[in-house]
Amino acid sequence: MSSTASSSFSLSIAKPSSFHRPGFYFGLRLPNSISMSSEGFVPRSSVELNRSGLRVSQTRSPIRASAATQVMDLSVGETGFKAPTIVEVDLGDRSYPIYIGSSLLHQPELLQKHVHGKKVLIVTNNTVAPLYLDKVVDALTTGNPNVSVEHVILPDGEKYKDMDTLMKVFDKAIESRLDRRCTFVALGGGVIGDMCGYAAASFLRGVNFIQIPTTVMAQVDSSVGGKTGINHRLGKNLIGAFYQPQCVLIDTDMLNTLPDRELASGFAEVVKYGLIRDAEFFEWLEKNMQALMARDPSALAYAIKRSCENKAEVVSLDEKESGLRATLNLGHTFGHAIETGFGYGQWLHGEAVAAGTVMAVDMSYRLSWIDKSIVKRVHDILNQAKLPTTLPETMTVEMFNSVMAVDKKVADGLLRLILLKGPLGNCVFTGDYDRKALDDTLHAFCKS
């Protein structure tokens, strides 16, 4: 068997067009400058996959100014609090806003306008509940006495992201006699958001839900885009559904109670956006990582906003991960193998993604697809964020191969990977690579 894997599908992307920099989508150059017009429209690529291959055409689609501009909205609303910045996830009649700002739980109208029935179920965990459950209940019920709020408190941790824990959500929903007009609210990090979203997608064949992410990881990544699900003992996120929320409310004040390790974990996903599609953002991160680690409010707000803009644009173009969206999984194939092989909860998700990103970058360099300077810059920025760049000693080549064989990106028995290729800010999603480079990377990082 040849050492070269092959695939008919290869995808090349760059940074978001709204950032006024030249780039590539599916290997084709976009205009050098794409900006907001006076009519409030921005050009956007329309991507179609047909029998003859990929075709890209330029269309003009309405996008709310809040999703296309780079200026933070600092206006003061009627409540006396600053109005949030809004990033729109453009999915036609299923579009929804991401509200970003401080003191958003003190602006109850933001949540209440997305609750359409009279019953709400808050899904949270035993770490977040003592800190924010009462505040969210107040935000849902202040001036809104007809709404009835129930809650279910789950154990905290990735190891509880399973079917047994999910059943506790269904038990509470059924015991509370919730109907199809109810709303589920995910209050917590990525584990809670994924489980609550999957519960909402499944309960009575689908009810509304809202995301209130409380970690950097959830705020910049998992709460946006509608990926929901649970883990299986044989692999991470193998059971789930695409199911979009009514809105995402990101109150940056919630990060004040986030442990340092959880804070750093989230920055792995932030760095990812710079590597795969937004080189200018990566350069900003290199200069501002210390401010982010010190929880500088303005730096955090900007990093969250820019990350959400990147995620929202990709999701708007490829909701169901048919190609473009898969590139958001840089480092995740290796990272998921680490989480599964080492044991769920031993490392935080972002820690595993950081180490997985280093492996993906190493493999990209072995393929001669990137310059060695990029390898060093990735190591340096992850070290700044105090994230791991080596593997747990117990990980073996055999463990990686076993777990990656059932990865969601395997197609017809072929493992497709997200790798960097070209200048910083460009990547490919492909199965067309020299298998020896993958083997060499695995043996370089594993002791056996």
Regions found by a protein language model. Name each.
Residues 198-291:
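A glycine/threonine-rich phosphate-anchoring loop and its flanking beta-alpha core
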Residues 101, 122, 213, 251, ...:
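Residue-level signal for inorganic ion chemistry
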Residues 170-187, 196-211:
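Non-catalytic interfacial helical region
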